[in-house]
C-alpha cells in the first residue's frame, strides 16, 4: 500500500516543528542545503519514531528541485509539501536572497506542482516582510507572478536590488504572487497551495536577525503588536496544519499572516500591548 508523503524543504526551527506535527503515520522527506543539519535532524526524528528519508537540495537549481520532486513521488503519494527554506538579510547578499527566496520558491511551486497528489496541499513559508515591501507597479507584480522561473532573475528591475533587506522583502512579496499564480495549476491536479507570512519567530534565523543591525527595530515592532511577544515554531506549525488539513478545503492561492499583529499595528498606529 502506497504511503502518504510529507515533504519538508528546509529543516530549521519551523521546518522541524512542522515535520513533528504533521509527520506521524507518513513518510517524511526532509530536504535542506546544509547536509550536516539535515542529517542531524533526520536522525533525531527517526529516534522519535518518524519514518524519515533525507535528501540534500539546492532550491536555487532546477535540476536539484526536480530530482527532489521525483524522489518524493517515488516514495508514495505526495499529499503535503511545505517549503520553509530561505535566507535572511543578516545571512546573505541581495543576489543570494533573490536566488533562494525568490527563484527557489518559484522552482518548488513548478516542480512539486507536477507531482502533488489529488487532494494534496502545499504551504510556502514567506514572511510579514512581504507586506512591508516597497510598492510595486502592476507590470512588476505581473512579471513576478507569471515570468517563467528560469527567467525570473533576469527581470530588469531586480538588477537594481542591492540591499539584502530590500531583496528579502521583495522576494517575500513575490512569494505571495507566485502562490496566487500557481493555485490554478495546482487546482487542476485537485490540490491546493497557500503561503504563510510569519512575523518574528524564535528560530535560529529569527534570533540572528534580532542580534543584527535591525534588531532594535524588530523588538519595537514586537512591543507594539497585539500579541506583544515573539512567535514560536509551534505557532507556525499550527497554522500550517490548518492549511494542509480538511478544514481549509476551500482555501487556495492566499496568504495567512501569522505575525502576532505586527503589520496591523504598523498600518494603524495601534498602541502597544503593554500600554
Label the predicted regions.
Residues 1-29, 33:
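Canonical Rossmann dinucleotide-binding motif of NAD(H)/NADP(H)-dependent dehydrogenases/reductases
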Residues 45-63:
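Rossmann-fold cofactor-recognition segment
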Residues 60-76:
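Conserved Rossmann-fold cofactor-binding substructure of NAD(P)-dependent oxidoreductases
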Residues 82-90, 100, 126, 261:
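Conserved NAD(P)H cofactor-binding loop of Rossmann-fold oxidoreductase domains
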Residues 89-91, 118-189, 200:
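Catalytic loop of short-chain dehydrogenase/reductase
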Residues 192, 251-253:
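Short, small/polar-rich loop/turn modules that mediate ligand/substrate recognition or access, typified
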Residues 198-208:
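Short, flexible catalytic-loop segment of classical short-chain dehydrogenase/reductase
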Residues 225-236, 247:
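A conserved structural motif in NAD(P)-dependent oxidoreductases
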Amino acid at each position: 500500500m502506497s504511503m502518504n508523503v510529507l515533504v519538508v524543504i528546509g529543516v530549521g526551527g519551523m521546518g522541524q516543528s512542522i515535520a513533528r506535527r504533521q509527520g506521524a503515520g507518513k513518510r517524511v522527506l526532509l530536504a535542506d542545503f546544509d547536509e550536516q543539519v539535515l542529517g542531524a535532524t533526520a536522525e533525531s526524528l527517526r529516534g522519535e519514531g518518524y519514518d524519515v528519508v533525507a535528501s540534500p537540495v539546492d532550491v536555487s537549481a532546477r535540476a536539484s528541485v526536480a530530482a527532489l520532486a521525483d524522489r518524493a513521488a517515488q516514495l508514495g503519494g505526495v499529499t503535503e509539501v511545505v517549503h520553509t527554506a530561505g535566507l535572511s538579510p543578516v545571512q546573505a547578499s541581495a543576489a543570494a536572497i533573490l536566488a533562494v527566496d525568490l527563484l527557489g520558491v518559484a522552482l518548488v511551486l513548478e516542480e512539486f506542482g507536477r507531482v502533488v497528489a489529488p487532494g494534496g496541499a502545499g504551504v510556502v513559508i514567506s514572511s510579514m516582510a512581504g507586506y512591508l515591501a516597497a510598492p510595486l507597479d502592476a507590470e512588476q507584480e505581473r512579471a513576478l507572478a507569471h515570468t517563467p522561473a528560469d527567467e525570473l532573475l533576469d527581470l530588469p528591475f531586480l538588477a537594481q536590488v542591492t540591499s539584502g533587506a530590500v531583496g528579502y522583502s521583495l522576494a517575500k512579496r513575490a512569494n505571495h504572487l507566485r502562490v496566487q499564480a500557481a493555485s490554478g495549476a495546482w487546482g487542476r491536479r485537485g490540490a491546493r497551495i497557500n503561503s504563510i507570512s510569519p512575523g518574528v519567530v524564535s528560530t535560529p534565523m529569527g534570533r540572528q536577525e534580532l542580534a543584527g543591525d535591525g534588531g532594535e527595530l524588530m523588538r519595537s515592532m514586537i512591543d507594539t503588536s497585539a500579541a506583544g511577544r515573539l512567535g514560536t515554531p509551534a505557532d507556525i506549525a499550527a497554522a500550517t496544519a490548518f492549511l494542509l488539513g480538511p478544514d481549509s478545503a476551500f482555501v487556495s492561492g492566499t496568504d495567512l499572516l501569522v505575525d502576532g499583529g505586527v503589520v496591523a499595528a504598523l498600518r494603524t498606529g495601534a498602541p502597544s500591548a503593554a500600554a
